[in-house]
From Swiss-Prot:
<comment type="similarity">
    <text>Belongs to the eukaryotic/archaeal RNase P protein component 4 family.</text>
</comment>
<keyword id="KW-0540">Nuclease</keyword>
<comment type="function">
    <text>Part of ribonuclease P, a protein complex that generates mature tRNA molecules by cleaving their 5'-ends.</text>
</comment>
<dbReference type="GO" id="GO:0005737">
    <property type="term" value="C:cytoplasm"/>
</dbReference>
<keyword id="KW-0479">Metal-binding</keyword>
<keyword id="KW-0862">Zinc</keyword>
<protein>
    <recommendedName>
        <fullName>Ribonuclease P protein component 4</fullName>
        <ecNumber>3.1.26.5</ecNumber>
    </recommendedName>
</protein>
<dbReference type="InterPro" id="IPR016432">
    <property type="entry name" value="RNP4"/>
</dbReference>
<comment type="subunit">
    <text>Consists of a catalytic RNA component and at least 4-5 protein subunits.</text>
</comment>
<keyword id="KW-0963">Cytoplasm</keyword>
<dbReference type="GO" id="GO:0004526">
    <property type="term" value="F:ribonuclease P activity"/>
</dbReference>
<keyword id="KW-0255">Endonuclease</keyword>
<feature type="binding site">
    <location>
        <position position="83"/>
    </location>
    <ligand>
        <name>Zn(2+)</name>
    </ligand>
</feature>
<dbReference type="GO" id="GO:0001682">
    <property type="term" value="P:tRNA 5'-leader removal"/>
</dbReference>
<feature type="binding site">
    <location>
        <position position="60"/>
    </location>
    <ligand>
        <name>Zn(2+)</name>
    </ligand>
</feature>
<keyword id="KW-0378">Hydrolase</keyword>
<dbReference type="GO" id="GO:0030677">
    <property type="term" value="C:ribonuclease P complex"/>
</dbReference>
Length: 106
């Protein structure tokens, strides 16, 4: 258990380092950090937390920074995230608060 926690901490460190490196302009080094974190995740059988998993492109491993390497668009209740490097797209359905929706129906 202790080993998996160490691996998870290292994965998080690498992804944060990649994000900061990409912000400073070195996308190649940032990609390498993300690839290394992904490899640690696979080899150590540790899942990357969702918050960090959404910080990079699944196709080219580039950290997604709004306006620099990522474009965000809203269509109705759908958020579309597009990587500006490889044009990979991910769609998220945004739902409102279910409790308030039920109260409005009554």
């Amino acid at each position: 258990m202790r080993r998996k926690n160490q691996i998870k901490k290292r994965i998080i460190e690498l992804i944060e380092l990649a994000y900061n490196t990409a912000k400073s302009g070195n996308l190649e080094l940032a990609r390498e950090y993300v690839k290394l974190a992904e490899m640690y995740s696979r080899k150590g059988k540790v899942e990357i937390p969702l918050k960090y998993k959404r910080m990079f492109c699944r196709k080219c491993y580039t950290p997604l920074i709004i306006g620099v390497t990522e474009r965000r668009r809203m269509r109705s209740k759908i958020l579309i995230r597009t990587c500006l490097i490889c044009n990979w797209q991910r769609r998220y359905v945004l739902s409102g608060n279910k409790r308030s929706d039920k109260e409005n129906e009554s």
